[in-house]
């Protein structure tokens, strides 16, 4: 059992002065007092639902045992984390002919409990998270954060484009929410195999989109098409959402939209690191 095991790499302490010198070289205005690697560590700890003020206290306690470690205050932590650039797929290795599975899931914007919703009839809605997952490595190649009223099909192009920057795609697996002529046509134009489940009452008429017509002909009356084409690998994206929610919870702490997006990107980035560790 390794869940909850804390592995803390303190290499950034040894290179504290060297990293700060490089960061402040040519900088105008106030100087940085904390290296970026240290801020990334704080961001990771914060992603595990440890608020910034408690994080300040945690680092003050840790600094008593680690020589050279300086504990920043609450304001500094918040300011630096809010401006930190997060590359979700930084730990992803480039590959060819990659198959991705895409889907979306809702994340609560508060953790005050369902009882409050029922008693006071208060509805704050959800944040919708769209992701594209490599079915081989289970790593997230692309992520988009939207309001709850944004349809899944509209986000496919952005997920595919985001994934293409990290890997050469060969196939996209998606459920019926992504069934549209525009999506089939887009994937075909990119040279990507569209493995999208079409609606049961879909017409056999192509309507100007032959890739979708071929999918309708293939799926209609063929109960084995899922197994033959590997549609079952779509569960990889559902597995990714399940892991994210079990590790980080089903809600977010941030309130402002830019910070909400940053928090979710950070959690996805940490998830990818976990998946890379499992692969190794």
Could you tell me what each predicted segment is?
Residues 1-29:
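Basic, low-complexity segments
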Residues 14, 145, 208-211:
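Soluble, non-transmembrane catalytic domains of enzymes that act on hydrophobic metabolites at membranes
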Residues 24-50, 57, 70-193, 199-200, ...:
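Polybasic low-complexity intrinsically disordered regions
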Residues 44-47, 222-280:
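Basic, amphipathic alpha-helical segments enriched in Lys/Arg and hydrophobic/aromatic residues
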Residues 51-58, 211-217:
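Short, compositionally biased low-complexity segments
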Residues 66-68, 273:
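Short arginine-rich
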Residues 176-246:
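Helix-centered, glycine/charged polyanion-binding patches within enzymatic domains
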């Amino acid at each position: 059992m390794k869940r909850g095991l804390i592995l803390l790499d303190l290499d950034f302490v040894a290179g504290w002065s060297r990293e700060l010198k490089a960061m402040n070289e040519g900088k105008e205005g106030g100087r940085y007092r904390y290296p970026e690697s240290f801020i990334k560590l704080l961001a990771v700890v914060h992603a595990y639902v440890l608020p910034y003020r408690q994080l300040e206290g945690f680092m003050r306690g840790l600094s008593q045992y680690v020589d050279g470690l300086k504990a920043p205050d609450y304001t500094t932590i918040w300011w630096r984390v809010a401006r930190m650039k997060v590359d979700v797929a930084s730990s992803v290795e480039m590959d060819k002919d990659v198959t991705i599975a895409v889907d979306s899931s809702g994340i609560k914007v508060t953790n005050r409990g369902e009882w409050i919703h029922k008693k006071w009839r208060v509805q704050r809605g959800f944040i919708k998270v769209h992701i594209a997952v490599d079915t081989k490595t289970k790593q997230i190649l692309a992520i988009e954060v939207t309001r709850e009223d944004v349809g899944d099909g509209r986000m496919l192009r952005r997920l595919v484009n985001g994934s293409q920057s990290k890997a050469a795609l060969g196939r996209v697996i998606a459920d019926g929410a992504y069934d549209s002529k525009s999506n089939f046509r887009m994937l075909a134009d990119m040279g990507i195999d569209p493995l999208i489940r079409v609606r049961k009452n879909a017409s056999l008429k192509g309507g100007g989109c032959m890739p979708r017509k071929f999918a309708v002909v293939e799926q209609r009356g063929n109960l084995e098409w899922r197994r033959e084409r590997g549609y079952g690998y779509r569960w990889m994206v559902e597995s990714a959402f399940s892991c994210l929610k079990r590790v980080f919870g089903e809600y977010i702490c941030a309130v402002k939209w830019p910070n909400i997006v940053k928090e979710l990107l950070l959690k996805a980035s940490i998830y990818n690191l976990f998946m890379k560790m499992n692969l190794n």
